[in-house]
Amino acid sequence: MTDIFQKRSLGNRFKQPTTDHEETGQSEQEERGIEPQERVTQAEMTDMRIDHEDHRESTHRINIFYPLPSHIHCKSTKKAGTLCRLRRKYYFCNMKERINWIDWGKALAVCSVVFCHLPQSQEWFYYRYLQALTMVVFFFISGYLKKDRGSDKENWKKYWHGLIIPYLIYNAVVYPYWLAKYYMLNGGLPQLTTALKPVFGALLFEHENAFCEPLNGPLWYLPAILIMHVIIDLCRKTKHQHRIMITLCIISFFVYAANKYWYFAPNLTPMGLMRNLPYYYLGYAFGQYHLYRAVNPMRDMICCVSCLAVSILLFAWHLHAFYTGQHLLHIVLFYPANIGFLFGVLYGCKVLDSIKLSFVTNLSIGTLVIIGLHVVLVTTANFALEHLLHLNSCICYQWYEALPTALLIIAILYPIIMVGKRHFPVLIGR
């Protein structure tokens, strides 16, 4: 997307900022005889996507050059960004905003992930419903916010800081906990071959077989997103990116259906990739064509209730088909049930769009912290309650017990999110 820079000379610094249809001086490109880039219209400015993954180098930041008095006024009202000095002594304030309903979607989805990782009865329909469908929200939003940074180098720089390094860090942080848990359960430290199993599992994207096991299972989401980003980057280099992506989504459906029947593919990352690629591409297509932007509370509420109701009915049919041995129908119903759930949640988040809470924004920013560390707290809570209640078997929560436990876990992790924002941005993928 074209950078939205409106430069003005110091001689005109007391004039009001111009609109995108006005010019108050030559740009540096014009002075060098280079054709200036096409200006962005007002509609495009208001229609821009905001990067929820990188707030420092985002192309969705709106950089507007201001005269110095205007900048000082903005600073006095705490509306301006950092005062910077460019080579030609232009003053600007860096203004950036977030899409609030996307923050709500990410925050609710990550809370649902923690809730579903607390062991509960599989006989409770809505637990299975959330357990099966929650992740589609993350994949849709990841596709919706996907953008081209101009070069493979810049893309991989983002992937390195936003996905690869956090994946390695959170696996490394959890490994000492894995050793401590093994020691408590077995009365001693593991042998070398056993101790290396989770290491190999982490290096193989949380794979599990006779030689390795997942170290931090929920992190399968990060390599899956990385692979999807790379697929999109490769398809963009062709003239038929959407045809290729649609073909890959269709193939992923059949491979996922076959795997559900024959179980030939390993779990977690490969299976998650096959299952969620269509939702990622759907989000990407919506983002590229600037769809799903308008907010209308009454319409959004009706759509939310309708989509969730249809999704619940389809998921109940989906489970019935499984129990009656109708494998093909079972798989076919799974995808529309996911679509209904996805848009039901997103429309619900649009209803909440006018409610802006810093807590919700920080949960959205700190999604990686919660995904990467909540398993440690979940298993610790399970272990403590089993011993406190003298249970002879694994604990099984009721929903009204699991919900406050999940909120407590999120509250414990919240300070880590705040510390990461201020001092260790690598923890939140920056």
Description of each model-found segment:
Residues M1-R87:
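Short, strongly patterned local motifs
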Residues Y90-R430:
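Alpha-helical transmembrane segments and their immediate juxtamembrane cytosolic regions
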